[in-house]
Amino acid sequence: MQVLNFYVNPYLNLSFDLLPVANHFCRYSRHWKMSRDITRPDELASLIQLQDRLQTQQDELFRKQQELQFRETYAGTGSTKSFTQGLIIGQLSVIILLGIFIKFFVFADSSTTSSTSGNGISSKTDVSNILVKRKKNGDGDAGSEGRSDEVDTILEKTYYDVDNHAPESLDWFNVLIAQTISSFRYEALQSDNIYHSLKEFLSKSELPDYLGDIQLTEIDIGDDFPIFSNCRIRPSKDSHGRLEAKIDVDLSDTLTMGIQTKLILNQPRPLTAVLPISLSVSIVRFSGCLTVSLINTNEEEFSEPRVAMDSPQSTRDDNSEEPNGTALLFSFSPDYRLEFNVKSLIGSRAKLQDVPKISSLIEHRLRSWFVERCIEPRFQVVKLPSLWPRKKNTRQPVSTTESDH
């Protein structure tokens, strides 16, 4: 562009300088021709030639001026195109740099991530870095001292003083337990499932040769509810670092099961004599101190040798499984109260009613069964379900679902 101006500007300046002179000369020549008579032909011819040359030079300057304007227009279009190209190239370069930054500085390398997840050691290291571990009081020992410190921390943060805190009533808990028992009773009475369950259990039980088949004659599941009261939290005497709740339980109700069987005398030959027997056993009163605590069954003190019973018959129930993880431990204190009402009827024609020896024998066997399973130092362990919310455990009222439709 500068080179073009260098060559064209002198012509433009000359044309602009000569243009007024030529115009003035033309006007003067016209005026001169009109004002006087021209008598000399050579002078007229020279003037005409001069006028033609001026006109030719003017046309040439006009043409060069048009060419200059055309070139300026073309140069402006070329500069516009170059500006557009530069803008596009600049935008593309910025986008490319931004993509490189996101790929290498924001996102992780897929191969590195897969190799890290496949390595067990690195995964454990990452988990240890993710989990926030609070500092514990003391030396952080894993033994009894560390557990005692943990119990003290729990009591401190829950503002509970085990020495001075007054016993609590469990009225709200009694309502929930009563509602649960009521629903169980309603289901048992409507579907007769308790009758079928007991009948199936008795039919599958192995009986001695001198007893005939056992038939159910009476089932009474009661109509009253247990009362829990006087709840207090105490440190466990058997295990350091564990808290337990002691609750007084009182139940005054009538829970009855009646059976009928036959005593068979097989000597000197089978079925020599048959003695009909009818029994009815009722629990009319129970009271005692219930101990409840949460345990971890993976710990050594709650392993199978500690849980196992002494007698071979009562070691473990059939089809039972050893629980793992968090479980509920409960037992009753030895100073419990359990009252029975046993009714018996023996004989076919001449019948013996309520024989004391039979009543004491049955009561002794029932007490032994209860002591071997639930009286301290023995205890029962109930595995607790997972408390994490899950989709399969989610429910909603049926009325809400129908109203939505």
Swiss-Prot record:
Molecular function terms from GO: lipid binding
Disulfide bonds: none
Location relative to the cell: Endoplasmic reticulum membrane
Main location: endoplasmic reticulum
Membrane topology: Single-pass type I membrane protein
Tree of life domain: Eukaryota
A biological process from GO: mitochondrion-endoplasmic reticulum membrane tethering
SMP-LTD domain mapped to chain residues: 166-385
Pfam families according to UniProt: MMM1
Keyword Iron-sulfur set for record: no
Alphabetical UniProt keywords: Endoplasmic reticulum, Lipid transport, Lipid-binding, Membrane, Transmembrane, Transmembrane helix, Transport
Gene Ontology CC, one term: endoplasmic reticulum membrane
Residues exposed to the Cytoplasmic side: 108-405
Region (Disordered): 303-324
Segments on the Lumenal side according to the record's topology features: 1-86
Keyword Lipid metabolism appears in the UniProt entry: no
Residue spans crossing the bilayer: 87-107
PANTHER family: SMP-LTD DOMAIN-CONTAINING PROTEIN, TEX2 PROTEIN-RELATED
Domain topic, free-text comment: The SMP-LTD domain is a barrel-like domain that can bind various types of glycerophospholipids in its interior and mediate their transfer between two adjacent bilayers.
Subunit structure: Homodimer. Component of the ER-mitochondria encounter structure (ERMES) or MDM complex, composed of MMM1, MDM10, MDM12 and MDM34. A MMM1 homodimer associates with one molecule of MDM12 on each side in a pairwise head-to-tail manner, and the SMP-LTD domains of MMM1 and MDM12 generate a continuous hydrophobic tunnel for phospholipid trafficking.
Function: Component of the ERMES/MDM complex, which serves as a molecular tether to connect the endoplasmic reticulum (ER) and mitochondria. Components of this complex are involved in the control of mitochondrial shape and protein biogenesis, and function in nonvesicular lipid trafficking between the ER and mitochondria. The MDM12-MMM1 subcomplex functions in the major beta-barrel assembly pathway that is responsible for biogenesis of all outer membrane beta-barrel proteins, and acts in a late step after the SAM complex.
Family assignment from sequence similarity: Belongs to the MMM1 family.
Record-given protein name: Maintenance of mitochondrial morphology protein 1
Natural source organism: Meyerozyma guilliermondii (strain ATCC 6260 / CBS 566 / DSM 6381 / JCM 1539 / NBRC 10279 / NRRL Y-324)
Taxonomic lineage of the native organism: Eukaryota, Fungi, Dikarya, Ascomycota, Saccharomycotina
